[in-house]
Amino acid sequence: MARKTPLNRIRNIGIAAHIDAGKTTTSERILFYTGVSHKIGEVHDGAATMDWMEQEKERGITITSAATTCFWKDHQINLIDTPGHVDFTIEVERSMRVLDGAVSVFCSVGGVQPQSETVWRQANKYGVPRIVFVNKMDRIGANFYNVENQIKQRLKANPVPINIPIGAEDTFIGVIDLVQMKAIVWNNETMGAKYDVEEIPSDLLERAKEYREKLVEAIAEQDEALMEKYLGGEELSVEEIKKGIKIGCLNMSLVPMLCGSSFKNKGVQTLLDAVIDYLPAPTEVVDIKGIDPKTEEEVFVKSSDDGEFAGLAFKIMTDPFVGQLTFVRVYRGKLESGSYVYNSTKDKKERVGRLLKMHSNKREDIKEVYAGEICAFVGLKDTLTGDTLCDEKNAVVLERMEFPEPVIHIAVEPKTKADQEKMGVALGKLAEEDPSFRVMTQEETGQTLIGGMGELHLEIIVDRLKREFKVEAEIGQPQVAFRETIRSSVSKEHKYAKQSGGRGQYGHVFIKLEPKEPGSGYEFVNEISGGVIPKEYIPAVDKGIQEAMQNGVLAGYPVVDFKVTLYDGSYHDVDSSEMAFKIAGSMAFKEASRAANPVLLEPMMKVEVEVPEEYMGDVIGDLNRRRGQINSMDDRLGLKIVNAFVPLVEMFGYSTDLRSATQGRGTYSMEFDHYGEVPSNIAKEIVEKRKG
């Protein structure tokens, strides 16, 4: 089966935006006008084709990047829907990785919002060229020019309008195309499928000329030939203007900007035209970097049909009918269904059972997949997100994706014994799908802990356990692993002697207990001389202490960072045994601990908060209230960075509090750093609570 669409007519694009900018509606309209959907799904009634997971239908927010294929004017557009909520930025990063271009959707009223800043930074990080679509022009308070200024100021970008609105709010009827210098007015009767091209209304002619001049000036800078023509006062042709916009868009020195109202079916066709005119084909983006696994040298993979197959797995989903789907972006060569691929990241071969082209939630079996395509592979067992699939003889490992450490953990308990096993399997599957979600067992409590990127992230995981895997689980309060240690040195003796007819028990030890440096652990030193305790009983003393230290004297938490020296003792020829010395060691340690000024330790997290300057005071005040120690403050990309150590126990609910304190514009990350001493008043509360 030969390739249907040449590589230069393929566009892999993502639609990225802040929650509520109208991103899903825009994707829907694209599918509608390109002839995929017949009835438009609305997010408001939960029928959008892109939003195909059940919870998305309820929450009205898009969670997973469904990859959908559609066609427009002889071009194939592979549309990757990205989530717009801060807890799902990992999904956005993951899709940015495989996009060639993006459409950034902004609300004409809300403008540049917090998540849009995060998503914009991610697109910069991966070098993704983009066009801006200012949506919801029909809403009260719509202001296209306001959004233009915010993009300049907040995102430090160079937006260049290529169309401007005719009217706003309920008088918004169409746009002025600044390239053709014509008015485009949509026809309400045909649900926006038809539009008329007219002369520019006289009251908007001045503004249109002013913005056309700005556009021509911006693109003349992109190319010497255009600059000469412009400076010579010659008129640039439509083709030359388009060429200039494309050069600037691809080198990211300018961002073409359009407007419309997806909900009212206006402006979607002009957006699709801009996607194929200005966003890059796979052949127009920088070659992707990789490593040759044999030589460890850097290699570059060019997007082309020639050469051996190479692709990147960027998303794993469990489909109730087909099983596991692995979404792959193909960078080079082609692959037939039923053939074998080599996973160079894992050094394993796997067979691809079927190849599926996804149309939001419908699927089409295809025989082979070519460079530049995005396709779901069925039948891969060992491949995870971020793995490279390629030809074994021409192996390459494409750039790995980086996944952040979870910032929140909660305990999950299955409601019934029957759920226990199902829960383990289900959590394993969810962790395969989502690399930012982790599962572990807490040694001290034996509970299963799940960790993720935020409270909403974990809520959705628990929700999916119930819906997709039919596992009922209770979630606990977030738990903190405290520790105990000692602050002073003490010597103690303990004699364990039991004589009550028959063979007795006898063990007698003298130990010295001393504090050690934080993080240095446990040390046992044997200073017995002259055989006062026989050699074979020494390990039993050590073992007794190690068992006792799992249960500290303050509140039953493990004791850390101390040294025990066994320096004297005595034994009985008949009654001494390993058991007796183990008990003697354990009792001596407990008595010594009580006298050695025991203290409680808690995990201290290294926290980095990134906020706009106006919220800095509030954020620092809040960290101080949480017993944080501020270490440093820096500037980065017009934002303030606060670095601090904060006790983990004080960080629960922080993402929600930070979001409301900074109107969602603050972001933070945290990781475990060290154990620190709990202040005595707080330690007292913890001990009393623990002893109940």
UniProtKB/Swiss-Prot annotation:
Positions bound to GTP: 17-24, 81-85, 135-138
Keyword Secreted: no
GO molecular function: GTP binding; GTPase activity; translation elongation factor activity
CDD domains xrefs: EF-G, EFG_III, EFG_mtEFG1_IV, EFG_mtEFG_C, EFG_mtEFG_II
Keywords, alphabetical: Cytoplasm, Elongation factor, GTP-binding, Nucleotide-binding, Protein biosynthesis
Database matches in Gene3D superfamilies: 3.30.230.10, 3.30.70.240, Elongation Factor G (Translational Gtpase), domain 3 (3.30.70.870), P-loop containing nucleotide triphosphate hydrolases (3.40.50.300), Translation factors (2.40.30.10)
GO CC aspect terms: cytoplasm
SS bond partners: none
Keyword Manganese carried by entry: no
Range of residues in the leader sequence: none
Pfam families: EFG_C, EFG_III, EFG_IV, GTP_EFTU, GTP_EFTU_D2
Residue span(s) of domain tr-type G: 8-283
Any one biological process term the GO annotation gives: ribosome disassembly
Localization terms from the record: Cytoplasm
Origin: domain of life: Bacteria
Family statement: Belongs to the TRAFAC class translation factor GTPase superfamily. Classic translation factor GTPase family. EF-G/EF-2 subfamily.
Role summary: Catalyzes the GTP-dependent ribosomal translocation step during translation elongation. During this step, the ribosome changes from the pre-translocational (PRE) to the post-translocational (POST) state as the newly formed A-site-bound peptidyl-tRNA and P-site-bound deacylated tRNA move to the P and E sites, respectively. Catalyzes the coordinated movement of the two tRNA molecules, the mRNA and conformational changes in the ribosome.
Name assigned to this protein: Elongation factor G
Protein source organism: Helicobacter acinonychis (strain Sheeba)
